[in-house]
Amino acid sequence: MDNFIVLYNPLAGNGTAQDKMRELESLMQGDRLYFSNMLDIRDYGAFFNDMPDGASIIICGGDGTLNRFLNDTEDIRPDCDIYYYPSGSGNDFARDIGAERGAPPVLINRYIERLPKICVNGKEHRFINGIGYGIDGYCCEKGDELRGKGDGEVNYTAIAIKGLLFHYKPTGATITVDGVEHRFEKVWLAPTMIGRCYG
């Protein structure tokens, strides 16, 4: 019987993460699962120090949950097996690595090392799928704001049109590829991908 700390995001999958946790329990009946709501964790360093010896971690959420975990724990992640149980609405990362829906959690340690990074306003971020810079990033940000208000379904086409016509202003960007720095002014769109899925 193995011990697993299941870090779950209750907002993942448009709020369906609780159902996915029940699926996980039935998939791993012979193991000991300890569930922790990621939204309640304020100090990952202290949280990891309190983990039972020999325990592994399962991240239960979507692409955003995984991305947030990786950035919040960049320099303090424990030396243990880290698994991923996709329970988001898109699960692009899971598709990229061939994880099947309803299958047991997949070991992801090899995928989360040496991730690409982006620096925005002086703050560095790692990403596991891709990032949207420009109107794409603007639309995602506005969509997240609307989703947070709970005003129904988010219409990204309307957000993009309003952004292009009235709100979004192109900005400058410095992009470094293979050690070579490139500077661009009035950038409208600069997506950067590590994964295969965009959208």
How would you name each of these model-derived features?
Residues 1-60, 67, 71-76:
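ATP/NTP phosphate-donor binding region
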Residues 5-8, 35-38, 75-192:
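Catalytic core of DAGKc-family lipid kinases
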Residues 61-62, 132:
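Helix N-cap/beta->alpha junction signal
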Residues 196-199:
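Short, intrinsically disordered, charge-balanced linker/junction segments flanking boundaries
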